[in-house]
Amino acid sequence: MARGELMKKLLASYGRDEDFRAVAEQIIDEEEKKNNRVLARTLRKTLEAGPQRTQSAPKALAPLIPFPEAAADFVERIEPEHNRNDIVLSAANVRVLLGLVKEFRRADEIRQHGLKVRSKMLFCGPPGCGKTLCAEIFAAELGLPLFRVKLDRLISSYLGETATNIRKTFEFARKQPCVLFFDEFDALARTRDDSGEHNELRRVVNSLLLFIDNMQPKGFLIAATNLDRSLDAAIWRRFDEVLWFDRPEAAMIGRFLKLKFKNVPVAFDPARNSAALEGYSFAEIERVCTQAIKAMIIERRKQVQERDFNRALQDEARRRAGQARLAPMI
């Protein structure tokens, strides 16, 4: 994006913490891509050292209706344990999510103009890249309870029962303001073109399409998948937004490393190792950081040394190599 446009967006967002920070992060990322690393580092330090957004008390959650027995077997309440400071997202995803939050807060006005409010999202990407964490934080930002669908209970071996269970779940979301979260969505929405699938699973997909079409939630429907290519082709247009959670690039890795070590004394700059971690998921990078911190604790030192980090990285690389050998067998 042209620098002039970014500066205009930055000034326009002044006073709105989320927007201001998102644009500032875009500017810093642009400088890093242009190899202006000293300037980027200075800007990031300035941003982090600025007045901290107050860690506001959790937003008041939407009132809970009495939990219906019909849905109790298929959904579980997830209590939020994280906030927006605990996640690193791409600038594109931040922009979409902020737009959805604003729409939700002005939903009545939008509907008065005869327009539809976006309420159905599909999260795609490899494991460990933040899909579930994003759903949790998104629900907390809206002040809505998060309910995760228990697929092991939802999917039944009895003819027609899975579709009945799906209907009960969607009826619950229609009455209860919430974020309804389907993880591993491909288990339900697998393509009907797969010759190995039997007629019952095809009927399940047909029912699912119908329920999503007719759903008018008081909150949001979020579905997440690691296997987007396995989804039925008709599923995609049922969602108002599709967000991609890819493995992070160097700039995002640097931010994530600083986040993971922010409360731990370190004897090196973790962000210097960003390039070595390209291609890793956030979950893998977090495991490297955790193991490095554990090494400091075990050896009773006051700081994490770079050698701790490097050893943890070597262990993770070994683990990845083993998984790569197994990949053709999975």
From Swiss-Prot:
Keywords: ATP-binding, Nucleotide-binding, Plasmid. Pfam families: AAA. Belongs to the AAA ATPase family. InterPro entries: AAA+_ATPase, AAA_ATPase_domain, ATPase_AAA_core, P-loop_NTPase. GO terms for molecular function: ATP binding; ATP hydrolysis activity. The keyword ATP-binding applies. It comes from Sinorhizobium fredii (strain NBRC 101917 / NGR234). This is Uncharacterized AAA family ATPase y4kL. ATP binds at residues 125-132. It comes from the Bacteria.
